[in-house]
Amino acid sequence: MLLPKRTKYRRPHRIKYEGKAKGNTKVDFGEFGLKSLDGAWITNRQIEAARIAMTRYMKRWGKVWIRIFPHMAKTKKPLEVRMGSGKGSPEEWVAVVKTGTVMFEVAGVSEETAREALRLAMHKLPVRCKIVKKGEE
């Protein structure tokens, strides 16, 4: 699972995922990428599930780059607790993904293998995505 080693603050303010991404919008490392068409918070479990789906389909050939990282702690209060008395404790770690962010990249495999691996990863994520080729963003 991906999570930060240390953070400056335990319980950060929420970061909005509306709007378009400013950076991380092009395929930089691999040949094919998975680009988000919506904004969302993606948990470290969803990132790991997508990574496993891709690497298992590619049978460990090629290389996978994960371009997002879950920096933000999402807090939750226990069940049946009254309102107030502070913010809840950190429950899970999420990555803030905006529209147009390239989340995963793949290289070293054929085009059909890369497209199928990225398609399998798409089904593990809570955002609509599209597969992009390097230079065709």
Swiss-Prot record:
InterPro entries: Ribosomal_uL16, Ribosomal_uL16_bact-type, Ribosomal_uL16_CS, Ribosomal_uL16_dom, Ribosomal_uL16_sf. GO terms for molecular function: rRNA binding; structural constituent of ribosome; tRNA binding. Keywords: Ribonucleoprotein, Ribosomal protein, RNA-binding, rRNA-binding, tRNA-binding. PROSITE patterns: RIBOSOMAL_L16_1, RIBOSOMAL_L16_2. GO terms for cellular component: cytosolic large ribosomal subunit. Pfam families: Ribosomal_L16. One of its GO terms (biological process) is translation. Transmembrane segments: none annotated. Part of the 50S ribosomal subunit. PANTHER family: 50S/60S RIBOSOMAL PROTEIN L16, LARGE RIBOSOMAL SUBUNIT PROTEIN UL16M. Belongs to the universal ribosomal protein uL16 family. Binds 23S rRNA and is also seen to make contacts with the A and possibly P site tRNAs. This is Large ribosomal subunit protein uL16. It comes from Spiroplasma citri.
